[in-house]
Amino acid sequence: MSMNVTNPNIAKTSMRGLTNFISDLRNSPSKENEEKRVTKEMAHIRKEFKENKNIDGYQRRKYVCKLVYMYMLGYELDFGHMEAVTLLSSTKFSEKQIGYIALGILLNEQHEMLPLIINSFKEDLLARSDYFQSLALAAICNIGGKEVAEFLSPLIQKLLIANTSSPMVKKRCALAILRMNRKHIGLVTPDSWVERLVSVLDEPDFGVLTSLMSLLIELASENPIGWEPAIPKVIHLLKKIIINKEFPKEYVYYHVTCPWLQVKLLKFLRYFPAPDDSQGGKVLGEILTAVFAQSESAKAGTVNHKNSLNAVLFEAINLIIHLDNDPVLLKQTSLLLGRFITVKETNIRYLGLEAMSHFASLSNETSIMIKKYQDTVLLSLKDSDISIRRRALDLLYGMCDKNTCKHIVAELLSYLQTADYAIREELVIKIANLAEKFASNYSWYVDVILQLITTAGDFVSDDIWFRVVKIVTNHEDIQAYAASTVFNALQSRNCHETLIKVGGYILGEFGHLIADNPQSSPLVQFNILHSKFNTCGAPTKALLLSTYAKFVNLFPELTQQTQEVFKQHQSYIDAEIQQRACEYLNLTSLNEDLMQTVLDVIPAFIDAKDNSNTTSNTANNSNMINSQDSKISSGGFNQSPQPSQQQQQQQPPQQQQAQLQQNVSSNGLDLLDPFGLGLGNQQQQQQQPVQQAQPVYQQQQQAESFSPVQSDTVSSFGQQQQQQQGGFSSPTIQASSSPISSGGSDPMQIKILASYKRLCLVSEGVLYEDSMLQVGLKSEYQSGQGRLMLYYGNSSAFPLTNFNVTLNSIAGLTLQPQSIAPVIQPKAQLQQPVTFSCTSEFTESPVITINFLTPGKPITITLRLPIVISKFFEPLRLSSGDFFARWKTISGKPLEIQEIFKSTKPIDIQSYNRVIQEGLNITVLKQVDPNPNNIVASCLFPFGSNGQPINSYIRIETNPQANMCRLTIRSQSATLTNTIKNLLISHLQ
């Protein structure tokens, strides 16, 4: 092929027609005139392309440029693409360049024309022209899809390692591979690439090396395993540049040798442990020492000189912190960082504080090294730049230990009074964590939290004051002190509502410990709390009503005052307050023994290993630099107390009162938590069998929503075996590294099945959770349409790479998931919106397959999404006569199914009604069957396969004494009849 590329520029002759056209559009007096001009020009160009068979390269180039310009103005194009493809075949650079520019603007990765130009890409890559190869590589980066990447990546790899390729082409090859791998994770694997990419590190051109290191850093960040062979050559390059001073003069930037390459080489080493061989470790130590020496000997220069020098220096510091194996270098690092945090330049101080935060988290020795800079860091809290203040706060958090805790917490409390609102929430979280983590006595911890509430109550989350009441409840030696301290704090005229909550709880439980003091007598305690009542919100008022009920049990002399309050709120507008008032009034009036049983002092919580400190998850969201700080140290005080067995069956506040009499009179059930704090251990709840007195659906409503604050799932189905009937199949899990059978005896399978069943009844919660991954969802449904938000949380300490989710539609249900990022960083979360629509009956839930890589092994998880047909049911309310009239019109199989089954737990009709109506969206019809042990229900499915809505009618006859049920379903669709049967048996059995 002959190449006419003497001057790689666009044609010397200007395209006057294009210039005039652009001028006409810019000078158009109105939008209408512009549209007329565009329409006229499009018609002319279309005619030329269609009729003029002898159009030359110049005209084709000019017309394509006009089309591209019109497209950039927002006008749609339905022609001209093939003319741009024709320009790609030209041997003239000016024409080929316009062709690539046009296709880069007009096409995208999913365009149907893309496969047609793959051969053009290939021909230009094989050409002997550097400029043609560069154009093709740029286009592949911009519009190349997965098919293009897989087809051309071997050819690009050959160009990268070929001795005949120019440095310009090699640089673009490395960057093209980087771009393709970012869009299609897993394209570049160590097995087939490491040897060839490492060989390019011998390239003498520093531009090629800089581009290649960008690629290697990206690959190592995804998964460092397999890329270790590059380490010796990277160390050799650093030695060559820093120690041997072997480098091209043109790569010296303001007296610093190739700072960009040095930074990339040092950064690459941070993804790997220290070199195994002693020689490599020794050379690396010499290199880092030389970097420090260069910074010491460097004279003050221009801003560019300082920036380039500091860039290398900070990367070397980060590498030393990562390796953590040379005491001499660590000491030098502490001295350098101490110097950096005192300079005037804000950016350097910021980087110094950030690096010192990482340095402090290494060990006790490194933390001690920087103790002498504590006063300097405290001064940084008063810096005018909020980013400096945030870094200083993080550093103080990392520097804190048992010896300095009280001083640092006192300084932070003082600073809290004047701190910006933007930083107060983070500051409160850190103070609370430090106070709990390093508390030498509990009274000091209580004082700190109360001071936090007084100073910045709006920023104190519920987690913090929940933690206070747990600790006070668990330690008798501070209960009187806490009650006295809270009582004194409540005497202030302006009390924050959070303080009132704490006061209400602690005085309700332990107010009797200070009642002997005339200044804090029972009546005084009641009056102080009630004086705040009208200023509080509904949740706090509900808690105070519980406190008043506790007062009646502790101080009978307050019965009249508290009952007056209960009577006043029997008709309160808020349902929760009204319900509590009514039930507490009856409870305190009818049976003293019952009242004493229900309102007894809450028992101590059982200590159990907790996954986080007071608010560690929230603190992590505030960029707390030491991940270890979010973990709980050993010892009872720093562990999260869990409730005793007596508290493991507590219900949410909205449901406590409705079940009050039944709960207390039932054998084996636990006392209520009148304050509604939900302080129980959900993991222990999961192990408890479902009791008759607690309806299944009420338990399911306790399930937590999936959020960055991770928590244990609550299984409301206990150890039930899965149903293998019909279409209601098990939400099985399969992992390629450790296959798990679908049998119901496996603990993981039981947990997954329980989560799946629960989410079939509620709209949000956790679907799957193990030590690496947590999958949660939130859903909503309306008129045959649904929206699902899937959450993928990385619970591990390493990134999950090649993260890919496959969701396939099923017959009757169309799913449209959005794409997600391919990597989940440690302790981070991805969200994936999914929209779906129901078109006809469907029997099974759709399957979601999750694939990702962990260090050392690939993982595949297959689950069923809790999208069941009942989510699309609509109410069908019928009178007794209408129901039986319609019932009689359907009979016989397959439209009628009858099945007898035995319940695995005591039959509770109210619980069944809630599961059927609130969970499965099936309308329970009242006063249709005179037998109170029978249930009659109906539902409407609007999307029948014949285009007509389908009515379904259900009867459930129960025998509570024998724990037997007979289920009869009649429907206008055999498929729907069988599906409803499986759903009901699964959730009622």
Swiss-Prot record:
GO cellular component: AP-2 adaptor complex; clathrin coat of coated pit; clathrin-coated vesicle; contractile vacuole; plasma membrane
Stretches forming HEAT repeats: 112-149, 188-225, 368-402, 403-440
Subunit structure and binding partners: Adaptor protein complex 2 (AP-2) is a heterotetramer composed of two large adaptins (alpha-type and beta-type subunits), a medium adaptin (mu-type subunit AP50) and a small adaptin (sigma-type subunit AP17).
SMART domains reported for this sequence: Alpha_adaptinC2
UniProt keyword terms in alphabetical order: Cell membrane, Coated pit, Endocytosis, Lipid-binding, Membrane, Protein transport, Repeat, Transport
InterPro entries from the UniProt entry: Adaptor_Complx_Large_Subunit, AP2_complex_asu, ARM-like, ARM-type_fold, Clathrin/coatomer_adapt-like_N, Clathrin_a-adaptin_app_sub_C, Clathrin_a/b/g-adaptin_app_Ig, Clathrin_app_Ig-like_sf
Membrane topology type: Peripheral membrane protein
Residue stretches of biased makeup (Polar residues): 624-638, 704-714
Keyword Repeat appears in the UniProt entry: yes
GO function term, MF aspect, one: clathrin adaptor activity
Location relative to the cell: Cell membrane; Membrane, Coated pit
Signal peptide bounds: none
Ranges annotated as biased composition (Low complexity): 611-623, 639-703, 715-745
Keyword presence, Acyltransferase: no
UniProt organism field: Dictyostelium discoideum (Social amoeba)
GO process annotations (BP): clathrin-dependent endocytosis; hypotonic response; intracellular protein transport; intracellular water homeostasis
Gene (UniProt): ap2a1-1
Protein name: AP-2 complex subunit alpha-2
Family label: Belongs to the adaptor complexes large subunit family.
Sequence segments annotated as region (Disordered): 610-745
Main location: membrane
Protein role: Component of the adaptor complexes which link clathrin to receptors in coated vesicles. Clathrin-associated protein complexes are believed to interact with the cytoplasmic tails of membrane proteins, leading to their selection and concentration.
SUPFAM superfamilies: ARM repeat, Clathrin adaptor appendage domain, Subdomain of clathrin and coatomer appendage domain
